[in-house]
Amino acid sequence: MSTSFKEIRVSMATTEDIRRWSYGVVKKPETINYRTLKPEKDGLFGEQIFGPTRDWECGCGKYKRSRYRGVVCERCGVEVTQSSVRRERMGHIELAAPVTHIWYFKGVPSRLGYLLDIAPKDLDKVIYFAAYMVVSLDEEGRKEDLQDLENELRLDIKQLRDACDASIASAVSELERTITELQDAKTSASRINKVRSEAENKMANIRREYDDKIEHLERVWDSFKALKVGGLYAEDDVFRDVQDRYGDYFDACMGAEAIKRRLEDFDLQKTAQELGVQIVECRGQRKVRAIKRLRVVNSFITSKANPACMVLDVIPVIPPELRPMVQLDAGRFAASDLNDLYRRVINRNNRLKRLLDLGAPRIIVNNEKRMLQEAVDALFDNGRRGRPVSGTNNRTLKSLSDMLKGKSGRFRQNLLGKRVDYSGRSVIVVGPTLQLHQCGLPKLMALELFKPFIVKRLLDLALAPNIRSARRMIERGDPAVWDMLDAVIKARPVLLNRAPTLHRLGIQAFEPQLVEGKAIQLHPLVCAAFNADFDGDQMAVHLPLSLEAQAEARVLMLASNNILNPSDGRPVTLPSHDMIIGLYHLTTVKPSAKGAGRAFSSVAEAIMAKDRGDLSISAPVKILFSNIVLDGKTLDSAVVETTLGRAIFNEALPDGHPYINELVDKQVISSIINNLAEVYSKVEVANTLDKIKSVGFHWATRSGVTVAISDVVSPPEKQEIISKYETQARGVQQDFEIGLLTDLERRQALVSIWSEATDRVAEAMRKCFPDDNTINTMVTSGARGNWLQVRNIAGMRGLVANPKGETIPRPIISSYREGLSVTEYFISTHGARKGLVDTALKTADSGYLTRRLVDVAQDVVVRERDCGFTRGVRMPVTFRGDDGELHKVENAEHSVYGRTLAEDVKTPDDNLIAKAGEDISGIMIDSFIAAGVESVEVRSVLTCRSKVGVCSACYGRSLATGARVDIGDAVGIVAAQSIGEPGTQLTMRTFHSGGSASAVDITQGLPRVQELFEARTPRAAAPIAEADGTVSIEDGDRARRLILKSDNNEEFSYTVLKRAQLRVKDGSRVSLGDQLVEGSLDPKEVLRVKGIRAVQEYLVNGVQQVYRSQGVPIHNKHIEVIVRQMLRKVTVVDHGDTSMLPGELIDQSRYQELNREAQAEGRKTASARQEVTGITKASLATESWLSAASFQETTRVLTQAVISGRRDPLIGLKENVIIGNLIPAGTGLSVYRDVEPEPRPEAISRMYPTRRPEIENLLEGDSVDPEFDFSSLTQGLELPDDYPVQ
């Protein structure tokens, strides 16, 4: 399949674009008429705009049927077309006033704020009509007229002063006249003084009033002189007067209109140049802000987007089928929240239009404009600003942004995970008789799944004249239908899936076998891969349809081809439970059993003796074998002292396999199957596994293993052991009470005493269990349970932890067999409940970790055979022990196994063992150890130089197949699944070493893995030496200071907690990178001080440490794939003469490419420093905006992508799934895509063994003669006697 495009670009829609895409203007807020149930004209569901509600029928019914296709009804204005256009056609709302898009001004960071250099708070004031913004200013006119205007102002001030003087003079003459009159009237002095005082107050008020007016004029003048474009001014008397007096020189407005006018006049190129100069000249915060602003400005320049598009004059109305209205019972309706939000916008918009037409006062109009802005904000992103808009029951309405983001958003709900046809679901039951590649499919389910294929076959073989008849035959359950079903399913694999699908083995292909009943039958050996059991689990069945899909299912996904676990390369289809019991019983030796000491000439003879009842399968006997492998040698014949049971077991193993003459428990069977997988073909291994399974079940049935209460044997000496340790514990308590011990020492002593007591009881208990005890058999063989569980049941419960994770120093002495006291029961359940809560939390945390890992590694696909970079990393194979001998490095099979050698491996005396380019197998590791090789240089994904993905040579073997990884293998996804799948097994706790706050808390388990993959700085991170030198220690009151004096006299100081355990002493000599204190390191510091290789090792080893502590095997290369993704970015330090910006986080390959271009053109190159980014940050910083948007922070990613006109090169898997392309992995790669599979003639003849030339001719014709005799075609078909021939 060839795609029509290679990349996707997202950019801003202009007003013209929206009008061009739209099919009409939505003018009314109405949805449908509740009487007629038809959409209202010009409303949110209008048929004139969005298309008809019925196929090929206009709104009024004048035009019906498809012959009127494309006709627009002159009566109702509806176009005659399919109703499906209501999913595609959009309308628009013409706004009465412009509004700002909330994503651009309320996002973090505010793009509008950076562009216009306005603080978000000030921007908010302008947009929501709380302040004016100056949008244009005639600076030249102001400059020219400034003197005249000032003279005019001075004249006004002079006039005010003259008026003031005149008013005061008038008041004085009035006062003198009044006093004269009062004196003439012989009024008292007090009265005259009162009149004088009042007059003076009046004159003071006059003076104050005129002074205020003058001061006001001065303020108006100062404000006018200080006016600048972009300046913000509150709506007060001063600014109103500035507008009245000097309104000809400037223009100021409020709301989105002000922003729009600023953006229309905004010069991007000029601003970019000014900011470039600022970056060079400025320092500190000004430089940082200039860089951030330039980043936004450059985004607009590169995308050629018009910034004015951030302000909207029209709003798109999405198709009505995407915001449906559904009729419920009792005549009520349920509608999408978007309809309510659109209705609010339309109502406010119509009201604003009416107010503008009426010429309403400005304050009322501004208030309505603000409400319109808020309504549009709620439509685009409800709750981003202010209180979210709520509907009925106080529920927040879902906006357009909410439709995209989150688990139930468009990306994750509909684009990345779709429901599929040809699928079913049922409960699973065990199918012990199935082969490894088979599953049991219920007949009824198969009939429904394969219905179209059965119909086709019935038509092909002329057993039904048409599709309707064929369907009726299937519904009736005609006998011929079952024959057709048998024939159809023969060559068709089905896929079985069990949720949760934590790794690739959660979906496997099987050949279906028809079974009665309604439950799917599952092979017992694949249960481990699916993590399935038969306590009510359900599984889904899917049907691969195309020939390519069937071929892939058969070759890549068939259960018998998926024997190895992709996480560590070990077999996952291991016998367990009953099978182990059976094999253990079969290979047990009982010296006194019947027939012991006899000799037989063959296994057959021994079996005959057993059938006669003369020989037990457990009796030690001598048997003559032919063609047997013993001690690595193949012998023509040999007499082996063994048991008949062991001989029967060895018959299940393939020819040429060494004879297993030992008791077969879980460990032995595991090593046998490991060896089989390494040496034999998959077909042979699958056959052997089936034989072992059958033998195991057969002899498990005959072993008669049962459990009774009498099998639980308690040690008789338990009380004696307990009383001895009780005395010791009492002594410790007394020492504490008289003050000889601290509380911490007491707790530690008691824990130590009771741990020893528990071990002694467990030891005594194991001795009490006889060899033939069934519980003993189960535990010893590895079939079920362990000695710790048996100790709880039969010995003593022992020490338990409280919910904080601390050990309670008083043990539970009773066992479950004896029964717990009330106190013991309470203490026991206290910690146990915490365990259950932890498990629930762990599952969610682990799932989220897997999701982040998948997201960061999803585009790591093998793209080429060899990147050509031959240097690798050195890995140890052996180490020299205290005895001076070489020993194999623990976990070598999880570090060097399956890798490609980067250089020849030679013995110390220069003999060649392995050549560069060879893959390291288990056998090769053994040869390295035998030859005394200490370390080897291997290729690694950490050093791979492939531009996209990784190369096959650097990755090495695929652990799932045991062969070199193929081009197209999605190794990133496999790595993420391998790390994430066992996540639930990891513990949640932060453990305390000692008492609750005695030492530094050590983060372990899942939180530690998250801490490492997110490259977080740990709490109380341990410092590392930044140079070679000597350490001195200074003790303070609360903390210690470590002072490192380097060899070149530099001094470094580190402050550490008083309780931290030091790794150095005063005067110790340290080397660069040495850890000075116990605890976790900060990966960023490791990178800074020791370099990239050290941080790679630290992260890989840190993650492995957590998984190994829980006994979870994972190969290093999976962790390396994730670490490679974490180290892909660099931070630009000096941008030189390139288009990069200082402080910019950029992909390493892109950085090198831009530097090469600069070098070729003779420009100054940039310099950068390596960064270690956490997986979340790395996922969001990916080249693909589609992948990042579907991961997290959808609105932020989309906003940035739109502004910068981001192009998605469609390299990763997620982005191709989203747009419906084949994924660029496996057979989806162009290398394999052009292959056209066709069935061979022999395959067709095998599918249709009874097809004859007459049928071929009949099928090629266009029509069938009604007189044609179909019975002639059924001659020779094997049909049941009672089958009616039509």
From Swiss-Prot:
SUPFAM superfamilies: beta and beta-prime subunits of DNA dependent RNA-polymerase. SMART domains: RPOLA_N. Zn(2+) 1 binds at residues 58, 60, 73, 76. Zn(2+) 2 binds at residues 867, 944, 951, 954. It holds the Pfam family RNA_pol_Rpb1_2. The RNAP catalytic core consists of 2 alpha, 1 beta, 1 beta' and 1 omega subunit. When a sigma factor is associated with the core the holoenzyme is formed, which can initiate transcription. This is DNA-directed RNA polymerase subunit beta'. The gene is rpoC.
